[in-house]
Amino acid sequence: MARAKFERNKPHLNIGTIGHVDHGKTTLTAAITMTLAALGQATAKGYDQIDNAPEEKARGITINTAHVEYETENRHYAHVDCPGHADYVKNMITGAAQMDGGILVVAATDGPMPQTREHILLAKQVGVPSLVVFLNKEDLMDDPELLELVELELRELLSSYDFPGDDIPIIKGSGLQALEAMTKNPKTKKGENPWVDKIYELMDAVDSFIPTPERDVDKPFLMAVEDVFTITGRGTVATGRIERGKVKVGDTVELIGLKDTRTTAVTGIEMFKKSLEEGLAGDNAGVLLRGLKKEDIERGMVIAKPGSITPHTQFEGEVYVLTEKEGGRKTPFFAGYRPQFYVRTTDVTGTIKAYTSDEGKEVEMVMPGDRIKMTVELINAIAIEQGMRFAIREGGRTIGAGVVSKIIK
């Protein structure tokens, strides 16, 4: 029988498993759901159910992602797991599954591998705030000294990407042993099996170490303008979805991007043709602005709390370039390439000045399917901030997806 909707009386977090191929991410995900299902806090999902992840589209890109949900004593979690490495890259860059924290899975038998590094780097670039490590396949390691060396290497690696390597909890265990114990006896509780206890230990670490994210509604107000029209006798209305924060009638706001920043006041808020006193994050609303004409506002501007976001023209972005099969380009491109950058609600033309590899070396040519860091200069200043997502388009089709990793100017 389908379970009723989770009660939202606990803080909600989005997390995911990341790490090198075959290090045990999906097995661990299955073990977590089965362990917590014994407490009635999850629906048990087998390996196959998670591995056969459905396709989704995010910003015009197809990604395979498995979603499971579960709760601990303290929190409710939505957990994403991706079957393939390319899916992880796409997922993290498009923000299709925004992560408040990650469980980095590393096989103790291998130690950190190339994708381990790549996922840590990506987590840093796209702004995953916090990681916890599960050192998997402990059952296959006879030498405790070797296990300790792998842990030290991991802590150094995390520190080298500016994560707090010395403080990050590293839980050793075996996803497979825990999964097998739970499959044999689905009612296994804490204290009844050492491998299952490791899963509880991991979830305790996730509960205590990964901070609760600030709710969207508590952040400074921002709404991207989608449309503008005039109401005779009342003034100019900008419509859009409130991305974060809240706005009240009488609030002072700034209009940012494409033209000089202007300060104005909110004289009314409408939703579904009704007047409201306040608009909240997630609402599709119309905001009436004092003293502005229709031509003062255009799609692509943002209305925001004064001083909370500023217009910029130059930034660095971490980008995934679509393959031809994904609907992207057939041919490579070079420095000086001028596509459109689709940010929030509008396309802005920009020139790509340079490309940089993970090692910090300059790259001449970018191929479809590459992940690359690029330096971009837009022809118009728009409201940009670190961690913001964008698409790269050419003649209306998406050829890449990116996230702003650094503001230059």
UniProtKB/Swiss-Prot annotation:
GTP binds at residues 19-26, 81-85, 136-139. This is Elongation factor Tu. InterPro entries: EF-Tu_GTP-bd, EF-Tu_GTPase, EFTu-like_2, EFTU_2, G_TR_CS, P-loop_NTPase, Small_GTP-bd, T_Tr_GTP-bd_dom. Monomer. NCBIfam families: EF-Tu (TIGR00485), PRK00049.1 (NF000766), PRK12735.1 (NF009372), PRK12736.1 (NF009373), small_GTP (TIGR00231). PANTHER family: ELONGATION FACTOR TU, MITOCHONDRIAL, ELONGATION FACTOR TU-RELATED. Residues 10-214 form the tr-type G domain. It comes from Nostoc punctiforme (strain ATCC 29133 / PCC 73102).
